[in-house]
UniProtKB/Swiss-Prot annotation:
Location of region: Nonapeptide 1: 184-192
Main location: secreted
Low complexity compositional bias, start-end: 320-360, 377-390, 403-450, 501-540, 568-590, 600-640, 677-690, 698-719, 754-763
Name of this chain's protein: Adhesive plaque matrix protein
Record's comment on post-translational modification: Hydroxylated on proline (mono- or dihydroxylation) and tyrosine residues (to L-DOPA = 3',4'-dihydroxyphenylalanine) of the tandem repeats.
Length: 872
């Protein structure tokens, strides 16, 4: 620990140059600082002893001399020898066994016992001090080869001799394209042949593909494009920049709006004869009927006041950005008002037929009959979003590379191919819910149909008295070696017999519920009609429990060590279990009027929701407190010595009573609310209004007698060793627990068709639908020609001695491999500053900045006698 502390001190000394925290450090001629046991922080040199075993110097040169080592030259001593720079004080631990450089001899002991030492300096070499920022350049002997160290994250890029040809390496996912010699004859490689399995019509297969198959991307389920009757007119939706016009009465045909760059052709009602639109510079020559009164012409900045027929009711005016289209009576054909820069077109009476003139570049659009509804035109980049009726299921859009999955008619039955390792799962009727598979150690929780009435579990020694239904014909008992003869219905068509290890599962008509076939050592159970509810059979040592009428709810029995897991209704909030010393904080419903708190020995039973009837476990001496519905107002009982205190309304301020020794404080004005000061032992007596119903306080030993409502059903109290039977709500269906040796026989719904279990050597005979065309069976030596999908690129097989030339993608940068004797030339990042290590005998030659003034060096014969002040 001492060494660690001193090393931390050294770190502080080296870093805090500006504070000159160098006290307690001794400087040697090389510029290293050693203090206390800090020599353990340095690496030992070759040939030296480990720290603490022998006084052998451990030295590591410092390349940078910190500022604090520029010693101060003011001493209180009368004699100030040149070249000696003692510190003003020492660290508390100074004087411990310390390692110094070879020429250094310690000069100080503990302060209290200090005696001056006559110190000699052989061949004194000047100690050099540098400015704080100076980094001296180290020179090395010509033969020195530095060992370079790198940062941990540095990944070196090796260099190679000119003649080196690297062996290329590739990423793990790279699949090389193999080239072959011209004389190579490709031998196709096939997967082991396995006939295609066929399945009943209701089987929905999981399709698998060969390893090289490039799977089509999976998309959201395909929804076909809805087809509409010829008269269907879709409602078009527009991009976000579209500003829809207000909706009008059915007879109004709206003016369409388009993207900003669109110049629309205005559509008009059927009776309107259109006026041409011209460029802004076009001035038409207007002709009028004899009765027309011309409208005066105005300067360009004039904002015309629109004139309307006498029956027109004008709409309010809006701010400039708003372009209001006024509504007019049916016979009026009006143009809208526009911003100031717009040159308005003249308005004419309804019967006016203008002579239209066009600019030379104008291409007229054809005129249509009155019933024609024009098709909207959009900018070239506009892609309309079509809206559909609520029942429309859109067809999804796919990327260009999407290859659609073929759709088939509902009656299509696909023929599925599987990989060699595929193990077919038995097919079930559509209503069948598959049985989950679990690890070998899994003990299943048996699930029953809603009508299932569980039978209790018994200890292993229980012998049951078996009861059967009136129609039950008992199965005779056979010796263990008996192999039962399977019975079939009259319509059964027997399948061919198989070798001994195989037991064929008979096929039955659809209504028949057959039992599975088992290995030879299995004692088969009898098969029953679907409506039969089997009686569970038990081992010979089992003692049966009598059967009860359907309305009987059995009391579950458990082994002596069984601790039942209590099940509560969904609304139940469980009470946490606490250590015996826990004092629970009681929570109440919102309408609950709390009873008074009790002294420490009393353990309060929390109240639960109204529907929950819970039995809490208490010590034997405890008399349980009843729980009430939220609206119950308890009648409080008191001991005979109780004197009730009156209760008061909320606005009542009680008159405080004081003990005889109380000295009242002076009275204050009404606004002042004074808190009385009382002696420490004072307990004020509260006064209450007449309507107050007091809460009783009891002595510590008082056990309250609780009164209950008439509908309350008390639960008995039990001794501490009693393990109570859990009470459940009426709808609770208990989970039956069985002894460890009990193997449960699962019960299934009437429609369940069991999955047969076979011997390990059993190979099932596949059943095929009527449309199945079987593939021929081949001899073991037959190698079929494999058919692949169109996109399949076969991977050829080669002779064992063939070494393919691998082709790589253009962006691949190979990682070369080298001969074992190759020593790469290491390259470094530009910012890397190597940490240089030196041989043990190397003494660096120090170089100095131009402004450096060396301190005086002394001849070898100089032996200064150092005297220290008395406070040392």
């Amino acid at each position: 620990m001492e060494g660690i502390k001193l090393n931390l001190c050294l770190l502080c000394i080296f870093s805090c140059d500006i504070f000159a925290l160098s006290n307690g450090n001794i400087h040697n001629v090389y510029g290293s600082a050693y203090s206390g046991a800090s020599a353990g922080a340095y690496k030992t040199l070759p040939g030296s002893h480990p720290y603490g075993s022998k006084h052998v110097p451990v030295y590591k040169p410092m390349n940078k001399i910190p500022t604090p080592y520029i010693s101060k030259k003011s001493y209180p001593a009368p004699y100030k020898p040149k070249g000696y720079y003692p510190t003003k004080r020492y660290q508390p631990t100074y004087g411990s066994k310390t390692n110094y450089p070879p020429i250094y001899k310690p000069i100080a002991k503990k302060l209290s016992s200090y005696k001056a030492i006559k110190t000699t300096y052989p061949a004194y070499k000047a100690k050099t001090s540098y400015p704080p920022s100076y980094k001296h350049k180290i020179t090395y002997p010509p033969t020195y080869k530095p060992k370079i160290t790198y940062p941990p994250t540095y990944k070196q890029k090796p260099s190679y001799p000119p003649s080196y040809k690297p062996k290329t390496t590739y990423p793990p996912t790279y699949k090389p394209k193999i080239t072959y010699p011209p004389t190579y004859k490709r031998k196709p490689s096939y997967t082991p042949y396995k006939p295609k399995a066929t399945y009943p019509p209701t089987y929905k297969p999981k399709i698998t593909y060969p390893p090289t198959y490039k799977r089509k991307p999976s998309y959201t389920p395909y929804k076909p494009k809805t087809t509409y009757p010829p008269t269907y007119k879709p409602k078009i939706s527009y991009p976000s920049i579209y500003k829809p016009k207000a909706s009008y009465v059915s007879s109004y045909k709206s003016k369409k709006t388009y993207p900003p760059t669109y110049k629309p052709k205005i559509s008009y009602p059927p009776t309107y004869k259109p006026k041409p639109s011209y460029p802004p510079t076009y001035k038409p020559k207007v002709t009028y009927p004899p009765t027309y009164k011309p409208k005066p012409s105005y300067p360009p900045t004039y904002k015309p006041k629109i004139t309307y027929p006498p029956t027109y009711k004008p709409k309010p005016s809006y701010p400039t950005p708003y372009k209001q289209k006024p509504s007019y009576p049916p016979i009026y054909k009006s143009k809208s008002s526009y911003p100031t820069s717009y040159k308005s077109k003249k308005t004419y009476p309804p019967t006016y037929k203008p002579k239209i003139t066009y600019p030379p570049t104008y291409k007229p659009k054809p005129s249509y009959p009155p019933s024609y509804k024009p098709k909207k035109t959009y900018s070239p980049t506009y892609k309309p979003k079509i809206t559909y009726p609520p029942t429309y299921k859109p067809k999804p859009s796919y990327p260009p590379s999407y290859k659609p999955k073929t759709t088939y008619p509902p009656t299509y039955k696909p023929k599925i191919s599987y990989p060699p390792t595929y193990k077919p799962k038995a097919s079930y009727v559509s209503s069948y819910k598959s049985k989950k598979t679990y690890p070998p150690t899994y003990k299943p929780k048996i699930s029953y149909p809603p009508t299932y009435k569980p039978k209790p579990s018994y200890p292993p020694t229980y012998k049951p008295k078996i009861t059967y239904p009136p129609t039950y014909k008992p199965k005779p008992s056979y010796p263990p070696t008996y192999k039962p003869k399977i019975t079939y219905p009259p319509t059964y068509k027997r399948k061919p017999s198989y070798p001994t290890p195989y037991k064929q599962k008979p096929s039955y008509p659809p209504i028949y519920k057959s039992k599975s076939s088992y290995p030879t050592s299995y004692k088969s159970k009898k098969t029953y009609p679907p409506t039969y509810k089997p009686k569970i059979t038990y081992p010979p040592t089992y003692k049966p429990k009598p059967s009860y009428p359907p309305s009987y709810k059995p009391k579950t029995t458990y082994p002596p060590t069984y601790k039942p897991k209590i099940r509560y209704p969904p609304t139940y909030k469980p009470k946490a279990s606490y250590p015996p010393t826990y004092k629970p904080k009681i929570t109440y419903p919102p309408t609950y009027k709390p009873k008074p708190s009790y002294p420490t020995p009393y353990k309060q039973k929390p109240s639960y929701p109204p529907i929950y009837k819970s039995k809490s476990s208490y010590p034997t001496a405890y008399k349980s407190k009843k729980t009430y519905p939220p609206t119950y107002k308890p009648k409080i009982t008191y001991p005979p010595t109780y004197k009730p205190k009156p209760s008061y309304p909320p606005s009542y301020r009680p008159k405080i009573t004081y003990p005889p020794t109380y000295k009242p404080k002076k009275s204050y004005p009404q606004a002042y609310k004074s808190k009385g000061s009382y002696p420490p032992s004072y307990q004020p007596k509260k006064t209450y209004p007449p309507s107050y119903k007091p809460k009783k306080t009891y002595p510590p030993t008082y056990k309250p007698k609780i009164s209950y409502p008439p509908t309350y059903k008390t639960k008995p109290s039990y001794p501490a060793s009693y393990k109570r039977k859990t009470s459940y709500p009426p709808t609770y269906k208990p989970k039956i627990s069985y002894p460890s040796t009990y193997k449960a026989k699962p019960s299934y719904p009437p429609t369940y068709k069991p999955k047969p279990s076979y011997a390990s050597s059993y190979k099932p005979k596949i059943r095929y639908p009527p449309t199945y065309k079987p593939k021929p069976s081949y001899a073991s030596s037959y190698k079929p020609k494999i058919r692949y999908p169109p996109t399949y690129k076969p991977k050829p097989s080669y002779a064992s001695s063939y070494k393919p030339k691998i082709r790589y993608p253009p962006t691949y940068k190979p990682k070369p491999s080298y001969a074992s004797s190759y020593k790469p030339k290491i390259t470094y990042p530009p910012t890397y500053k190597p940490k240089i290590s030196y041989p043990p005998t190397y003494k660096p030659k120090i170089t100095y900045p131009p402004t450096y003034k060396p301190k005086i060096s002394y001849p070898p014969a100089y032996k200064p006698k150092i005297s220290y002040p008395s406070q040392y």
